Amino acid sequence: MKYQRVKGTQDYGVEKAFLKDAVESLFLKEVRLHGFEYVELPTLEHAQLFRSTVAQSDIGNKEMYEFLDKSQRELCLRPEMTANFVRAFVQNKWHAASAENKYAYVGKVFRYERPQKGRYREFTQAGVEFVGKADFFKDLYVITLVLRLLAKLHIKYTLKLNYISNKETRKKYEETLHKYLLEYKDQLSESSQKRLETGNVFRVLDDKEDSQKDFVKNAPKLSDFYSEEDKEYVKNIKRGLDTYHGLEYQFDEQVVRGLDYYDDLVFEVSIKDSKAAQDVIIGGGRYSNLIKDLEGPETSSIGFAMGVDRVVDYLMDQEVYKEHLDKLETAHSENEYYFWAHPEASYKLNFFVWFFNLQLNEHISSSLLFDYDSPNRNKAFEKAKKLNSKAFVTLEEDNSLTVYDFKYGTKKDADLKEQYHHLDFTSLLDSRHFDNLFDSNLFKPSPKELMCMCSAFRNRFGDSKALLKFAKQFHYSEDDVYFSDQKIKKSKWKSAKS
């Protein structure tokens, strides 16, 4: 008998397996830089776990690999990893260690789907879970991790987000949506008609076929049902995302994600300009009831899962990985900087935005951690020391910035009130902690970025000698350096040298 691989599975040859390993290694490296700790979870679970958590989704209805073991227990191969993680989180009381918990995992997932390119019955997910009190800062933090991963993988992407509020708001909305869609029932696909009958009306919005129909696009909007608190949350998310120059994103009310436990913010990342049917490579969102529903503490979490196989397929097709594979293998980071903001600081959002932009700067490979939950500086300070951080960066109640340099045992202060509108390299420079906060050999700015930095440097200090010393940190010659739109004359360099 000639044996074939099981339908929906893959054989990874040497080259593809090597690339898959590189992608997973990069993922683990980046999540650890963001303070997430790696855990491993079992592939086998009790089937009831997923029946109770994703019952209304296609996963819970028809895609699970279920079976009875020899003791007649109903088991399954996990179809997704969030419920898998939450079960472990609750059972092992991981929540007892801290109010703020960040975890990462990589593992095989199994779904009985119709196989096609980008959709397999056995595939690998890499994901994170940031457990703790709901906070839009944490949402932005997780999104920065997603964007940094995409930059490291050299993937051009489309980021879509939506805010689906809480159960109470959605219930009111779904009643209105159900009434509206009933008028068009005959024009819906068979699967969407079943969703109407079972009360899973929300899923009609992201149905591949029906979502493209005009009457679905013109359906009542969930945003019309937002509370003032919901509107403020969305506003803060948009403010945070808008500060990152060059970031393109869309708020799309048809993005609802397919799992029952999501609420508040949801998002997905697809490959830009892709013609593939399965182009979503990352999906995630916040869930505020799942942990409690599985008999854990009443707390929230935000996370995402990356489809490793889809990423690998895309990189193989584009062959861009060949140019960057050595960077995936050799990228490393040594230093950690721990950030904390006083709860009452009026510039807390600005401080986080500064941190947010540093996180997304692909030239900075240092580990930057933000403490969201410590109520005072002393507790945050002890955490920073425990993590062997190189420096502790704080925003005080009066909006002053303080940098504690553990390596040299120094402390420096600066008032950043007037500098918060600078959100690129200039903000680093204006903080006057550039050489202490970041080692100059960690990155080399582009000429355009250097022009911006030199302009700010000259305006602030007016010192040619300091400017020359500053530029030489990045191994630039005199002819490379600009301020405003003019080259610095060599005569100035000569006078600065003397």
UniProtKB/Swiss-Prot annotation:
It catalyses: tRNA(His) + L-histidine + ATP = L-histidyl-tRNA(His) + AMP + diphosphate + H(+). One of its GO terms (biological process) is histidyl-tRNA aminoacylation. The keyword rRNA-binding does not apply. Keywords: Aminoacyl-tRNA synthetase, ATP-binding, Cytoplasm, Ligase, Nucleotide-binding, Protein biosynthesis. One of its GO terms (molecular function) is ATP binding. It is an enzyme of class 6 (ligase). SUPFAM superfamilies: Class II aaRS and biotin synthetases (SSF55681). Its EC number is 6.1.1.21. Pfam families: tRNA-synt_His. It is found in: Cytoplasm. GO terms for cellular component: cytoplasm. InterPro entries: aa-tRNA-synth_II (IPR006195), aa-tRNA-synth_II/BPL/LPL (IPR045864), His-tRNA-ligase (IPR015807), HisRS-like_core (IPR041715), HisRS/HisZ (IPR004516). Homodimer. Belongs to the class-II aminoacyl-tRNA synthetase family. This is Histidine--tRNA ligase.
